[in-house]
Regions:
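NTP-handling and nucleic-acid-processing catalytic cores
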Residues: 1-225
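The substrate-binding groove and active-site-proximal loops of carbohydrate-active enzymes
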Residues: 196-198, 232-237
Length: 237
């Protein structure tokens, strides 16, 4: 009781490895971490999060929608997305181009050092006026440059809204949470992806740490068998 009175005992959550097959959590010692990690080629997804154009988005005088391009190797965590993390001192750019699938005009934000991974150099300042679906080379041009810290606080529309991940559900679990915003942290790099990290605090130690620091809330939409919970539409079960 003395430990409790002194504030040394408290209830909280932490991120732990979990085995759906065994139906139990596993310690890092049981898994011999970090020795269990190995480099493998895996499928990744680049996801477009639609920015809300209000006073918190410091990019002004841009026609059309603006999207944050985020990269993930765990697309099954996207329904639990609560934030986007950028590097505070990384250089980012706003690029005007076309969506290669819908062929509609679009403005996207990503890290400047990674532009060449998504856009061909010969397409820079290309022919926007005559672009159409049959044109192989996407025209693009940089409209603005800024630091990651300039994006902090910008808001975006929830990617996959459903009955199970409403704001009310999130705030029921974590009262006062303010999800769906851009936050900053030093763990973000420009080695892979877009320089914008999809952040789901329930899945991953870094995500949980920055989520707690920035009051994103927490949302676990996978059950103990590794299946999506009810309320996620076609994804459930």
């Amino acid at each position: 009781s003395e430990l409790y009175k002194k504030g040394y005992l408290y209830e909280s959550v932490s991120i732990q490895p979990y085995s759906p097959a065994a139906g139990t959590g596993l310690s890092s010692h049981e898994l011999n971490q970090p020795g269990t990690y190995k480099d493998v080629k895996d499928t990744s997804a680049t996801v477009m999060f639609k920015a809300i154009k209000n006073e918190k988005l410091k990019i002004k005088n841009v026609e059309g929608d603006v999207f944050f391009m985020a990269w993930t190797t765990t697309p099954w965590t996207l329904p639990s997305n609560l934030g986007l993390t950028v590097g505070p001192n990384i250089d980012y750019v706003l690029v005007q181009t076309f969506n290669p699938y819908t062929h509609l005009p679009v403005n996207v934000i990503l890290a400047k050092p990674l532009v060449s991974k998504y856009f061909k150099a010969e397409g820079e300042n290309g022919d926007f006026e005559n672009y159409e679906a049959s044109v192989k080379l996407l025209p693009w041009k940089i409209l603005a440059e800024f630091k990651g810290k300039d994006l902090e606080g910008a808001q975006y529309k929830q990617l996959l809204p459903s009955e199970a991940n409403t704001l009310e559900k999130i705030q029921e679990i974590t009262p006062g949470a303010t999800p769906f915003k851009v936050i900053t942290d030093s763990f973000v790099t420009t080695e892979d992806g877009t320089g914008i990290v999809h952040t789901a605090p329930a899945f991953g130690a870094d995500d949980f740490k920055v989520g707690k620091k920035n009051n994103l809330g927490i949302l676990t939409l996978v059950d103990r068998e590794g299946k999506f919970v009810d309320g996620l539409g076609e994804f459930s079960g």
